[in-house]
Amino acid sequence: MENSKWGGFLKKAMSNVETSIDKVLDGNQIEEMSRGNAKSKDEIIAKLLTEGQALSKNELKLNNTIKQLKKSLSEAETKLKRLDEKQATPELQVSDSKEMEEQLELQKSQFEKRISILEKEKEDLQRKMEELTVESMEVVRLTRQVETLSTQYSIQRSQWVREDEKKKKEIQDLKELYEKSEHGAKNWERERETFQNQVSQMSKQLDSLEKLCERKDEEIRSSQAFNMTLREENDTLAAQNLDLQTQLDRLQRELDTNIRSNVKSKPKKIVTTGGIPENNDYTVGKVDTLKVTKEDEDPTTPTNAIPIPSSMSKRDEALENDKDNYFDDLHPLNISTSPQPSPLSFSEIPQSDTRNALENFLDNLPSPSEERSRISRSASEARKLGINAQSRYASISSAVLSPPSEASRKFSLYESEAISPTSGTPSNLEKGAGNVPDVSLLEQLATTIRRLEAELQTTKQQVAQLIIQRDQARQEIVDAYVNNDANEDSKKQVEELRLQLQNLEKEHASTLVTLKQKSDKVFELELDIKDMRELYVSQIDILAGRQ
């Protein structure tokens, strides 16, 4: 009974072990432990195998001894039965029975001793069986641990598979990103080269623009200096114009006062002969005799006047006509704003009062060699400039300095023929000509000022455009440097991604190596488990066959 009990317990333990092993084998669950844990488990399994073999041997020996004892016990029982049968025989066999009893007592004592020894051995076997049960419990614990480890392994395997797939996907993404980054790096290199070329071109343009700006600045400075000189000259000319204007106003006022006084006093007509006086006032006296009208018939004329010859009268009439034409030419020029009578329009003027005024007026007249077109052109351009002083001077100079007509030139030729070398006033003429500024110089100065101002304006516009282009070029250079920095950062990122890819490839290779090692270890464990199962099955079969 006890042997059958222990056999059932061992069968149950072996069935539990087999079920755990079947779970491990069928589920392809491979424990993933460190090398130290695997080595300790291998040692425990080997120790259990050796102990199981020793226990199986001891169990076989004990079974054999039990069988022998049972056989001997059955023989002893048969002998006792025989003795009991012999006791029922007659008393003749008493002596033989006594001997047999003594032998049986002796055998009984031997059997009792043997039974005590067997009981001791049985107790030892029970202790050993208890130890085996403890070891079987250890085996059960180990099987449970194997199950937990197998579940952990399955979980870790699934996690590892997911991580492996994730790493493969990351590697694929990194490869794609690396390819894209390589393509982007090539594009960035091309863009960088183009940006560098643009920067070099812009730098060259900037240098040329700076040189052009320097040249324009020099031209502007030179034009400003020339403009300052022109302004100084213009100021001096304006001062001269003011002086001339004051002189002209003073002369006009004197002439007006003289004319008004002469008109009120009604002076007598003065007629001279064709002779030339010896003093320097001949010119004025001659001009006074030119205006001969029908006032000769006036009863106020003195009777002792010298008659004029016919040749002289014809000559005087021609001169009078030329003189009228000359003053008609002067009339539209508007010498002053107030209407004034011509100084030679009166028939009778006192010689003593108007001599100085006429001399000054004639001294201020220009020479016949000056061109009328030059003076009129300078006056019109001066009026276009809008400068008050220049326009005022132009109006005065066009009135005073306008060239004479053909009649006036004839009159001047007549005067040159009639005047003696000693009767003229060259000092006054030279003085009047020196006070009048050159209008052609004013015209040149005005045109030069306008041209320089236009050039200054265009130069300022060009400088502003050049500054804008310079700022744009600087901004493009800054953008190019920023793009270059971005390209450098992207290159660094590509290098980092390349290093990460290499590290991941190394980790993948190492994981593949460890996976191969683990798979080999699992294959070895599967073989060991199969051997253990076969061994346990053989032991169970042996125990079952002996029972």
UniProtKB/Swiss-Prot annotation:
Keywords: Coiled coil, Cytoplasm, Golgi apparatus
Cross-referenced InterPro entries: Growth_transcription_reg, TMF_DNA-bd, TMF_TATA-bd
Any Pfam family: TMF_TATA_bd
Domain of life: Eukaryota
One annotated Gene Ontology cellular component of this protein: cytosol
Protein localization: Cytoplasm; Golgi apparatus
GO biological process: intra-Golgi vesicle-mediated transport
Coiled-coil segments: 53-264, 439-535
Main location group: cytoplasm
Family affiliation: Belongs to the SGM1 family.
Protein name: Protein sgm1
Organism: Schizosaccharomyces pombe (strain 972 / ATCC 24843) (Fission yeast)
